[in-house]
Amino acid sequence: MSNPKSNPRTWRRLPALAQVCLITFIAFPVATGAADLIPAPGTKLAPATNDIVITAADVTVEKLGTNIPVSAIGEPVGGVTLSPPRWSDATPNSVAYATVDGAIAPKDPKGKPINFRVMLPASWSRHAIQMGGGGMNGTVPMMRGERAGSLTASFATYGSDSGHQMGGFGGFGFPGGGGARGGGGGGDDWALNEEAIRNLGYMQMKKTHDAAMVITERVYGERPRFNYYIGTSQGGREALTVAQRYPADYDGIVANVPILNFSTLMLAPELIRIQEKPLSNWVTRAKANAIRGEFMRQADKLDGLEDGVINNYMAARALFDMSEGDPNRNPWAALRAPDGVDTNSSDTSANARLSDGQIETLKMVYSRYKFATPLANGVKTFGMWLPNTDPTGSGLIVDQRFRGQEGAGPSAPMHSQLGILGVTGFLMQNVSANPLDYVEGGALNARREEISKWLDSTDPDLSAFYKRGGKMIVTIGTDDTLSSPGSQLDYFQSVLDKMGRDTVDTFARFFVIPQVGHGLSGRSYGTAGDGKTVPTFAIPNQYDRTALITAWVERNEAPGKTLVVTAGGHSLPLCSYPNYPRYKSGPPEQASSYESAAP
């Protein structure tokens, strides 16, 4: 995936980009095994040896049928219809395969259908992968060329548009302004429909899974021996959702940069703009160099090496998170303007100064946000963001004033971001509302609690998934300004608190790559914490998640809690939360010069 740091709006393309990542993950031959529930965690399974082979004659309307009974679907539906299957012969770039499209009708006559697709390779290894979506979904993820990876590996693949249709992709990233308030050609009305919202949150995954299982059995004569969910961003949230809600359906989960606290993540850019209603609180892009320089000055050295990389993310977070520690401290004191008044708003240098109001805004962005009342699963805060090298990324900082803010006239635009429907539609139930009218703990509080139950994948109790033998690998980046690394870290901790470290280590890996963004890529910063100019390099980030998860699930080969990742000529330990790579001695570009250390 392209680096969001270079262009925050690139996240609009997430479905296609996420699929590219998925192709990379799944284009590997793997072993197969048993279909039933794994008797106990760690049980080795005997592999199946022969693929099931089909031809076009095996995938016909007569054999497949035109519908699926509603009783076969584990969430309420109005019906399931199937389109005539299509056969594609092998080409130099693809194996032969069949495509089955279908539509799952809503129970609510005003609702939207779930469009889904199942792709069935001619030679099937008894594996299946449900592919996660991206952004706010609205398109079937398998409509863009991913078959070269999954089908070549003899996996059946399937996915859906999650129950609403968008003519163009619309995600929930945080551009600072502009763009259609709905962000898609399918209309905004779906955001006012309860069934459509709940489909997006969780039901579409189960409905699509159950339909795909019926189709797979009708075509091959049996269901998959191993079923995986692989997703990035929204798809990563979906992957964790199915582990939390439908654990019996999946053997392995790969979740990349999951948007766990989805309901608040959509609201977060509005919370920042609300904080910036007074002109004196408005942080502009001119301050970016000073902000990232201050992060580096205080946090670069915390990993034992000043090289333009903040590896010790937990200690760095603790410096700037005002929700913990001394509430009277000021981590931004070094940048405070004389008398707390910014007299040079156009200063773009690393020496730019901040007003007291701007400092309060930065404290808010880099501290846990406390809710008026707990949301789903008892979550009391939203983790917000960590010290990073991309403080303007994804609209965290904008150079525009919006209706409802001081200095914005009556004709000023209302603030818009790609997930605005999650605020005006899901929450405010008025797509024409001004999102800056939101008040924490106000009249919308009960609605906040309700949609949180539908959308947030924050249940720390993964015991059902663990007991059925499921395995998961979750990877996040601390420079991610599209997701919230703070909320991801807080979720990791909640799972450890609930289940215990020893148990978690038997079935899950929570990997953290310091200083990479939403695409799990990033670079070192050219000015180290001591102010010296240093060469920049790509942050090591490359490792094969799918090979790891299949080996763990199917051969009981657990990945290490510390791996080695590479990029270019550099390598670095990849550590499990909360550990980080601490420099010991030796060449800084070699992983052997570091150790996995607790914060």
Regions found by a protein language model. Name each.
Residues G231-G235, A239:
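Gly/Ala-rich beta-loop-alpha elbow adjacent to hydrolase catalytic centers
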Residues T241-A243, A248-K370, G526-Y543:
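A catalytic-pocket lid/entrance helix-loop region that shapes and gates access to the active site
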Residues V474-I476:
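Short beta-strand/loop motif that positions the catalytic acidic residue
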Residues G135-G221, L267, S432-W454, V516-T536:
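Cap/lid segment of the alpha/beta-hydrolase catalytic domain
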Residues N7-T32:
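Gram-negative bacterial Sec-dependent N-terminal signal peptides
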Residues R126-G135:
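Short beta-strand element of the alpha/beta-hydrolase
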Residues A35-H127, V140-G145, R181, V309-I310, ...:
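Catalytic-loop region of hydrolases
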Residues E222-T232:
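Alpha/beta-hydrolase fold nucleophile elbow
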